[in-house]
Amino acid sequence: MEKLLLILLLFCTGLRANAQSVSGKVFDENKKPIPYANVIILSAKDSTFIVGTTTADDGSFNFKEVTLGNILKASFVGYEPFTTVLSNQDNLTIVLKEDAKMMKEVVVKGNAPLHKMTTEGIQTNIENTILSKLGTCEDVLAHVPGLTKKKDGYEVFGRGTPIIYINGRQMRDATELERLKSSDIKSVEVISNPGSRYNAAVRAVVKIRTKKAVGDGFGFDVRSAYYQSENVDLSEWVNWKYRHKRLELFGAHGYSLDNGHYPSKTTTVVQTDTLWQQDFTQEVTQRNSIFKNTVGADYQLNDSNSVGIKYMLNFPHDFLLSGILSSDVTANGTFYDHINTFATRKLSYRPSQFINLYYVGKIGKMDIDFNADYLYNKQNDHTTYREESRNKVSRTVTSDNQERNRLIASKLTLGYPVLGGNLSVGAEYTYTNRNDTYSNPENYVPSSAAQLKESNIAPFMEYKHQLSICQLTAGLRWEAVRFNYYENGQHIANQSRSFSNLFPSISAATQIGGLQMQLSYAARTRRPSYRQLSNNVSYGNRFLMQSGNPLLQHEYIHNISLGAMWKFIQFGISYNDRRHAIVFWSEQDSHNSAISRITNTNLPSIKTISTQLAFSPTIGIWTPEFTALMKKQWLTLHTSTKTYKLNKPIWQFSFNNTFDFGKGWLLSMESYYIKRGDAEIGSVVRNSGSVDISLTKSFLKDRLALRIRGTDLFHTRKEGGISYTESMETQQISTYDSRQFVLTVTYKFNTSRSKYKGTGAGQAEKNRL
């Protein structure tokens, strides 16, 4: 840690004599602010570069401790550069004039996504670029460097699933990305090393900002999507809002239907006193539908203060799943049994509720951001396994599992200018109460009732200061957690615990000519989910059970990262050390070694290094995006049967192309390829990839849009993995119902984005639930 602090201090050296601060704003000739303009300081002696920055969304810039008499230069594509000699003045107003000779070139290059490095991450400008024409926010995120589209969401490479904010408000429902139109998005920022103001369990953040809401009156948009694969899926949404002066009312109502088909082949080898091997094939079908509702209100008290409320009420229909599992079992290489298992599963849900209250304001020079959340959900899970055995006794196993979750969370953040920088202080509090009961009438596994209560209070502080050649940000977060575990109504002292941790963070961002760089360190954590902590045992088959582990420790993660950007080229490298890494594991039943119990355990450490190289130029109507990613871990895994060296890197490549033909026609082609390698306690044993193509045509001045899309055209999105645990080796090959034809129709009338500014609290805790 001391060495890292020394490196960061050296990274920021270079203070000048006769220095003072200089700030100002850059406008065009119509007095509109110009964001992302380059503002640099040059030496008066030889015009060498000293320090530089880019303007914020409001056109503002700020330099601390610059030398008087040097030259300030402001420039932006399509405008004549502006220069002035620094004198004893502040709050400069700079007006850039259009460069008539460059206007034609600007028309050609104006579609290029514009990237810039911020004090937290890398921001991609969407407004007035080709990305604003893609359709939805989902489509935009698939084209943002550093983000990878996965089956169930998005991933920041080397960090995992990010927390997503829209206008500072925590995203609660993934369908918000489907409902948000690309034409309403201003920018997307990817933060791969979050600071202290975020929960320590948050390892990556995506911040989406929309264009400023304008105009009064009523507006709505309707979106209908039809998905045809082996099954039919539907997504139907209507969004509305009414705005009058300082008041805004808004709502969203939608229905989605998801049908799935998931075939797989699995082999498990268990080496105890007998060598057991199971080879089974599985065919699973599912049906899931839900009706979602969101309503809310926002009131602007004045130009600096607003309050709001949002309420979400969802009505999930019964989740229905059926499967056929056919397995052959051998013992020491000799045939033991053939078992056909017919499984049915029904999940019944109570309506889930979520409410958010917020206040965002300013009193004098102090910024205030307060949020309070409440969440409730409940589900019942009834499963029946009918096992038909050729050589042994056939049997039927039923189970009932009930879960109920309640969460209360709040967060307060205060910001104030201090010593030429900005100081943010605050605290976040969460309280969770989870009840989890499991019963098996046939007593093949024990019935139990668990209750988990956890409280977490986390004060934090963060300070930002502009030095002569870098922006320095330092933060500290302290989290105190109290966890109580109850089983069958009795408090279990040895599985309950209290602990506290400090999570420091520090980063430095600078610009040298056109090269932008950022070096950062952050300590994070990963907390086990409540299912991973539950001691309840669930039935898989007569050879396989699953349960949590109340003795799991939290991970403590050290991350160092370096990012750089030059024009349309981005590069990043990071080192990650996960102490007490949480992984899947297996244990054998003490009474019958043929029965394995899947659970979780902690490994001492998993160290990884991740790299990223991205290119995103614009060539006429064509905008290609190429990204190469590599992740390599160092892990020597010791089991009771063997020692494994799991050090082979995983490579991932993506190549996206967008063609803007004009007159409302847009063609998009996306592809990716993942190569085999090692990950945690296993390996990816099958290369996989996908090719998607979409064509969009807009009508009626972009109010009506028709889109045709084909996903996974060659049906190559197949996964294969192998895992190694204490006495068991498991290999699985899975195929997804991913080849689809999608038809989407969108109509919008008098629409503009919501002004709602609630950010929410306790999001990491919601994810654990």
Predicted regions and their residues:
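Face-selective signature of the C-terminal outer-membrane beta-barrel domain
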Residues: 3, 292-316, 342-488, 511, ...
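Short, acidic, small-residue-rich periplasmic hinge/interaction motif at the N-terminus
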Residues: 40-42, 75-79, 91-130, 149-151, ...
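Short, acidic Ser/Thr/Gly-rich low-complexity loop/linker segments typical of extracellular
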Residues: 45-60
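Short acidic/polar hinge/loop motifs at secondary-structure boundaries
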Residues: 64, 143, 169-195
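N-terminal periplasmic accessory domains that precede
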Residues: 89-95, 105, 137-140, 174-175, ...
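Surface-exposed extracellular loop regions of Gram-negative outer-membrane beta-barrel proteins
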Residues: 209-224, 263, 267, 291-295, ...
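Outer-membrane beta-barrel signature, preferentially recognizing the C-terminal barrel domain
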Residues: 346, 451-454, 494-497, 525-579, ...
